[in-house]
Amino acid sequence: MSSTIRPIAIGIFRCDDRILVGHGHDVLKGERFCRPPGGAIEFGERAAEALRREIREEVRDEIAEPHLLAVLESTFALEGVPMHELVFVLEARFLDTHFYQLPQVAVYEPGWDGHLTWELLDWFRGGPNAFIP
């Protein structure tokens, strides 16, 4: 168990009334969750730079106009491991507009076999679909 706070940058990519998210599953809790794309902020890196790097690595595209929406503190457990994150939430857009036409966006991340999907904002309201920042 790590006793450090992990700073991350996540990107809100909008397409009409949908946002792009990855889906996860906590086997121990039996719960599914969603989270926007992004990842760890490296030492000396700004949040917008981290989001650019993560999208370049994971989605193979460049982003434009990343701007900070909020900074959140999140504590939770994943697979029984306590987590503590400072989450920099940025809104951005893809330079390659074809991503907005796809039902799924491939992710190139070692150790993670999945994709991102466009989900309606209403999908997260009042239901079992947990949104983790």
Language model features with spans:
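Short connector loops at helix/strand junctions that flank enzyme active sites
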Residues: 6, 14, 36, 63, ...
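Conserved N-terminal beta-strand and adjoining loop/helix that marks the start
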Residues: 1-20, 40, 66, 91
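A short coil-to-beta-strand element that immediately follows conserved catalytic motifs
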Residues: 62-71
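Conserved Nudix-box catalytic region and its N-terminal flanking loop in Nudix hydrolases
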Residues: 18-57
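Nudix hydrolase/Nudix homology domain
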Residues: 29-33, 99-133
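Short, well-ordered beta-strand micro-motif
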Residues: 13, 89-93, 117-122
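Short loop segments at secondary-structure junctions
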Residues: 16-18, 25, 92-98
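Active-site-adjacent beta-strand/loop module that shapes the phosphate/pyrophosphate-binding cleft
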Residues: 74-104
